[in-house]
Amino acid sequence: MKPVYIVSWLFALAVSFVSCDDWLDKTPKDRLYPDVYFKTEDELRLFTNQFYNNLVPSAVDIYSESSDLIVKSDLMLEMSGQRIIPDEGNGWNFTALRDINFYLQYSHNCTEVNARNRYDGVARFFRAYFYFEKVKRYGDIPWYDKALDSDDPELYKARDSREFVMQKTLEDLDFAIANLPKTKNAYVLTRWTALALKSRVCLFEGTFRKYHGLEDYEKYLNACVSASETFMNESGYTLYKSGSTPYRDLFASINLQADEVIFGRDYEASLSVLHNVQNYENSTTMGRPGMNKKIVNSYLMADGSRFTDKAGYETMTFDQECQNRDPRLAQTIRTPGYTRIGSTKKEAPNLAYTMTGYHLIKYSMTANYDEYNKSCNDIPLFRTAEVYLNFAEAKAELGTLKQADINKSIKLLRDRVGMTNLDMELANSKPDPYLMSAATGYPNVKGANQGVILEIRRERTIELAMEGFRYYDIMRWKEGKLFENDLLGIYVPGPGTYDLDKDGTDDVCFYVGTKPAGNVPLYLEIGEQIRLSNGESGYIICH
């Protein structure tokens, strides 16, 4: 059974502070004081439960990421060119950190050493997570390891260096790794969650330092490799491989798939703890999200060859470009032959719901969850696939990657969907021009491992799509110029009716001037309701 975290009234009382004059000879019984609280394992657990709600990302933070991967009607300011220096802070909030430090300040009241170390591990995991998110956004940041009062002069101290904060973050993670339980549980923190976070943190910091010309990048990349290998060798986690569409089913599941998911966010219909991913993907009012054309182009063919090496790929129609591709494409967007879970009816992409024509399906379950705020599938936050990708990328950036390393990481991801393995020698001998291009790829990648680094980035983008990674991946790779590139949708040869999924029924009509007669489900006037890159033909222009 999934645990539900409810902070009791005891906790609410425990964090209430009052001042008592000396003449009081009794502690008021309507309050609990830190000096007399935190004495039992239950009290430690109750207090630290709040960190799950306060610091774990929500579903919307994960599935609706703004980047060059998913295009929506409302662009993030970084991509629209409208970002300005704000008049006041946004995200500069330390309330959650104060709660963590307050707990750590008093947890020594508990004399049960094992219990105290476990819940100190929870607190220090979340402090590491808090600071990792802040460093990603701000760089240098003030480090606090004690709870401050509103008049404490340390509130106004200068920022600590990125180097100092990241070192402290790793110390917290190492403590969590040593003290959290080894028993798998996708809904509470374990040793394996802490190793996965260390893998993530160290990959980010190592590659950020490498591509931004900072020192010690090797230290962090080696730490990423070490944490990843420990996880891979000791945790017992593997990839979810059940059924004919395991990648799709991994995310379209009420409960987290414990084979692969290390930790995730719990949603529960019976408690009205819900999110909105399915309405986001299947309505006209949630930004009409769709995958960007260049990301679709980056999916390989099913035999491992490059789609962008095919003659005429630029002007292929939707049904043509979807043929014989990496199976993860058809498990992430609607492609010809798509059916909803629980239905046998074939459904085409709906351009009323997606502005690019690449209609998202990741996280979507049966159609009854399409209504607003009805989704209750749990959201994976840490999964084994990410650790594999972190491991391979860190070794490639260090120059220590071997084919054997690929075989125990990237190969496993491709095996799940029936794809051929990545050949390191071939990748480095023939780097992909599409991924080298400033318009569609990563021109900053150089050196002997250029080809395999590009292929690992391709794999990461595809495997972790809509999981909240893309924006900061681009930032750490120093490829922010990607946000200046065009955001495009499917190719439309010209006015006319189109059977997008080739089921024998027309799905959309693109027209110029007077709307034609007929019974097509959707009519779009070129130049008014939709813009194409060549006027009356071309790619859908989204912004």
Which residues make up each language-model segment?
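Long, intrinsically disordered, low-complexity segments
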Residues: 93-94, 168, 248-300, 374, ...
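Conserved, well-structured interaction surfaces
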Residues: 33, 41-49, 53-57, 73-138, ...
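Short coil/turn linking the two alpha-helices of tandem helical-hairpin repeats
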Residues: 135-142, 184, 204-213, 397-400
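An aromatic- and glycine-enriched ligand-binding surface/loop that stacks and positions planar moieties
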Residues: 21-76, 166, 173-175, 188-195, ...
